């Protein structure tokens, strides 16, 4: 183990000098420094980011640098940060370094560990599947279905329901799927992670789930690398055990944001909107590892914050290129009280083809989008001149469009405590059948309000009956 000394500490950036004759650590190697706090020795892990020349390196701290001073000895571990993998990770909660943070027993020193930095699978190892992953959420299954082994992005601004949607997907898919799930909290609220942990514990899903957190209060180094920690755990189940793994990441934007902070601290010249010049490379290195191979699959569902609802911002725009399906959440729909606030016209999926979803599903989805698009075009006329200026056919279309718009909303299991309404899981065949009947005009006489926040069409009729229809 070669050793050096700290020469400079600027927040989470630490410069270490090894001497011009010493063997320098490689980029991404983990370095260890011990600091003395009130007589207790505490270990801090640093990761090598740059070589400065003259035997010095610049590192990023994975933990708080409070208490570090110039002259402290730093040891090179000779390898990258390594985290526990395998069956023993299930039901446990980890930080970026693979340390247990759920209050349970620590992992033994000889436990199997893998480095968090790794090359993406080669071209000939990749596998593409065309099987739809049923979520039980009507708007998703009908208009932008997810693929098993695919990558999904949940896009939305602040407070439009990304985390609630990801929690409902965990509830629906993890319980139905029965396989292994990995949840990675990247730079989000600790409270949400805590709530999710206890909910999963109550439902029993935690026994098949590994959880990794690097939350808002962590240094940028931890927030930038924690996604790789979760991914490393998922990769082991895929490559070694041949499992189909679900990988949830909340939130990919925070990964980019942490990269931006680190980049500025390392002295790199910022690029567009102040982001790091290496934004596309960093995103590519993460996303190319989240993939399905001939051994097993990783289906990833990633929440992606959209700053100021601007989809042209470089962070969400860079993520778009890597996804098979996008679910776009729209603030305008939350203001109308439609939850989940998924924009049916902006959301997309490569699964919407007759070959994958079938002819009937494809035709119903296209017709639903056509009706909603026409309604959108007519809204200006309605706002200025009123409904009376529309033709009879247009009036019928508007009525159906409004019923469809409301019927795309749904009560969630994870929101039961707030809404007082039981959550609903709707099978995909039932979803297609119900929307087909609405398009055919079978429910033109049923009040619009009965379609709001319900599951299958039977719930609509029951609600209409209770309203005196």
Curated annotation (Swiss-Prot):
The subcellular location is: Cell membrane
Q: Where does ATP bind?
A: 156-163
Single GO molecular-function term? ATP binding
SUPFAM superfamilies, per database record = C-terminal domain of alpha and beta subunits of F1 ATP synthase (SSF47917), N-terminal domain of alpha and beta subunits of F1 ATP synthase (SSF50615), P-loop containing nucleoside triphosphate hydrolases (SSF52540)
Principal localisation: membrane
Keyword vocabulary terms for this entry: ATP synthesis, ATP-binding, Cell membrane, CF(1), Hydrogen ion transport, Ion transport, Membrane, Nucleotide-binding, Translocase, Transport
Which principal EC class is assigned to this enzyme? translocase
Judging by the UniProt lineage, the source's domain of life is Bacteria
Q: Classify the protein's membrane topology as the record does.
A: Peripheral membrane protein
Gene Ontology terms: cellular component:
plasma membrane; proton-transporting ATP synthase complex
Q: Which reaction does it catalyse?
A: ATP + H2O + 4 H(+)(in) = ADP + phosphate + 5 H(+)(out)
This enzyme's EC code(s):
7.1.2.2
Summarizing the function annotation, the protein's role is:
Produces ATP from ADP in the presence of a proton gradient across the membrane. The catalytic sites are hosted primarily by the beta subunits.
PANTHER family noted in UniProt: ATP SYNTHASE, ATP SYNTHASE SUBUNIT BETA, MITOCHONDRIAL
Q: Which family, according to UniProt?
A: Belongs to the ATPase alpha/beta chains family.
Q: How does it assemble?
A: F-type ATPases have 2 components, CF(1) - the catalytic core - and CF(0) - the membrane proton channel. CF(1) has five subunits: alpha(3), beta(3), gamma(1), delta(1), epsilon(1). CF(0) has three main subunits: a(1), b(2) and c(9-12). The alpha and beta chains form an alternating ring which encloses part of the gamma chain. CF(1) is attached to CF(0) by a central stalk formed by the gamma and epsilon chains, while a peripheral stalk is formed by the delta and b chains.
The protein depicted here goes by the name: ATP synthase subunit beta
> In which organism is this protein found?
Lactococcus lactis subsp. cremoris (strain SK11)
The UniProt gene name for this protein comes to atpD
């Amino acid at each position: 183990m070669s050793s050096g000394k700290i020469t400079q500490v600027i927040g989470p950036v630490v410069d270490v000098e090894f001497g011009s004759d010493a063997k320098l650590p490689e980029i991404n190697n983990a370095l260890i420094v011990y600091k003395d706090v009130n007589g207790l020795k505490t270990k801090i892990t640093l990761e090598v980011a740059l070589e400065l020349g003259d035997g010095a390196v610049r590192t990023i701290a994975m933990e708080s640098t409070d208490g570090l001073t110039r002259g402290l000895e730093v040891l090179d571990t000779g390898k990258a940060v390594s985290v526990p993998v395998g069956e023993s990770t299930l039901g446990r909660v980890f930080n970026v370094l693979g340390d247990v943070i759920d209050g349970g027993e620590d992992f033994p020193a000889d436990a199997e560990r893998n480095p968090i930095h790794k090359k993406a699978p080669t071209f000939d190892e990749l596998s593409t599947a065309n099987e739809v992953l049923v979520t039980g959420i009507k708007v998703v299954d009908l208009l932008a279905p997810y693929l098993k082994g695919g990558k999904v992005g949940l896009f939305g601004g602040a407070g439009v329901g990304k985390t609630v949607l990801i929690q409902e997907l965990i509830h629906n898919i993890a319980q139905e799927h029965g396989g292994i799930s990995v949840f990675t909290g990247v730079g989000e609220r600790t409270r949400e992670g805590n709530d999710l942990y206890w909910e999963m514990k109550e439902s029993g899903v935690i026994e098949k789930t590994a959880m990794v957190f690097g939350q808002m209060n962590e240094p940028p180094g931890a927030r930038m690398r924690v996604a790789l920690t979760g991914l490393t755990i998922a990769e082991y189940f895929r490559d070694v055990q041949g499992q189909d793994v679900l990988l949830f990441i909340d939130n990919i934007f925070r990964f980019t944001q942490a990269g931006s902070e680190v980049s500025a601290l390392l002295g790199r010249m910022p690029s567009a909107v102040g982001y790091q010049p290496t934004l596309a490379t960093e995103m590519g290195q993460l996303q190319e590892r989240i993939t399905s191979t001939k051994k097993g699959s990783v289906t990833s569902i990633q929440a992606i914050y959209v700053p100021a609802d601007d989809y042209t911002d470089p962070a969400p725009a860079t993520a778009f290129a890597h996804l098979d399906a996008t679910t776009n959440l729209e603030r305008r729909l939350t203001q109308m009280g439609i939850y989940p606030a998924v924009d049916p016209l902006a959301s997309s999926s490569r699964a919407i083809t007759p070959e994958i979803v079938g002819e009937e599903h494809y035709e119903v989805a296209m017709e639903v989008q056509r009706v909603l698009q026409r309604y959108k075009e007519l809204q200006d006329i309605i706002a200025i001149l009123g409904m009376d200026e529309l033709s009879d056919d247009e009036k019928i279309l508007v009525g159906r469009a409004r019923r469809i718009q409301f019927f795309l909303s749904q009560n969630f299991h994870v929101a039961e405590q707030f809404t007082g309404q039981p959550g609903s899981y709707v099978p995909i065949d039932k979803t297609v059948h119900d929307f087909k009947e609405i398009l055919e005009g079978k429910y033109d006489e049923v009040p619009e309000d009965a379609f709001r926040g319900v599951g299958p069409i039977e719930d609509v009729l029951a609600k209409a009956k209770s309203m005196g229809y």
